[in-house]
């Protein structure tokens, strides 16, 4: 599971996801990418499930890059706890993903294999996604 080794502050505010992604919007490492079309919090468990699904389908051929990292702690109060008495303890980590962000990239496999691998990965994610091919890809 992905999470920061150490953070300056244990708890963070929720924030809001306005607009499109300002960075990480182009395929830069591999030949194929999976682009987010909606804003969402992607948990470290969802990222890991998508990674495992891709690796299983690609049979460890090629290379996968994970372009998002869960660096935001989400706190939660215990069940049946009364309101007040402070903020809950950090429960899990999320990556804030805005529309246009490339979340995963792949290299070293055919276009058909990459398409299917990303389709399987997209089923593990709570947002609409789009398969992207690098503009200068020769295949």
Curated annotation (Swiss-Prot):
Keywords carried by this UniProt record: Ribonucleoprotein, Ribosomal protein, RNA-binding, rRNA-binding, tRNA-binding
Family, similarity comment: Belongs to the universal ribosomal protein uL16 family.
Protein name, per record: Large ribosomal subunit protein uL16
Organism from which the protein derives: Chlorobium limicola (strain DSM 245 / NBRC 103803 / 6330)
Molecular function terms from GO: rRNA binding; structural constituent of ribosome; tRNA binding
Subunit text: Part of the 50S ribosomal subunit.
Region Disordered, residue ranges: 1-24
Free-text function comment from the UniProt entry: Binds 23S rRNA and is also seen to make contacts with the A and possibly P site tRNAs.
Keyword rRNA-binding carried by entry: yes
GO CC term (a single one): cytosolic large ribosomal subunit
Residue ranges, compositional bias (Basic residues): 1-17
GO BP field: translation
CDD domains: Ribosomal_L16_L10e
InterPro entries, per database record: Ribosomal_uL16 (IPR047873), Ribosomal_uL16_bact-type (IPR000114), Ribosomal_uL16_CS (IPR020798), Ribosomal_uL16_dom (IPR016180), Ribosomal_uL16_sf (IPR036920)
